């Protein structure tokens, strides 16, 4: 199910406030144009499977990964769902000697999100965020989690940059 942009979507959401995530409320507050795509949650599903179910190009669908550096600082990386984060490249671009993925059980207390529903928007606190530079080659919208399993946000990258500070870098495995 895909919901449209602008006022039509806002009217629909008013009658479905239970479906509205914190991410959507933040985007509304910042007057960001976006669409919400809903999919049936059927257990553990990969980002590639979600993109396929919604008919999305996996190069435009991004997963949100949370890491911790040797310094103890946390970092957020957004990579296309079919790609893998290169930990060495990622560490270098944030000035760390090395980084590692945080443990799944640490995700909720740290970000407010669970595995499979982690969004770069609306985390409990701001973390340095880097998106793979392939986003610069996309002239269309991008997709990322709406902060709840079963929901994806679609918006232009320039719109996302109005909400979070994000840098671009080559951070995927070749």
Predicted stretch roles:
Residues 1-12:
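Single conserved hydrophobic/aromatic residue that forms the stacking wall/gate
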Residues 13-174:
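Extended, low-hydrophobicity, polar/charged segments
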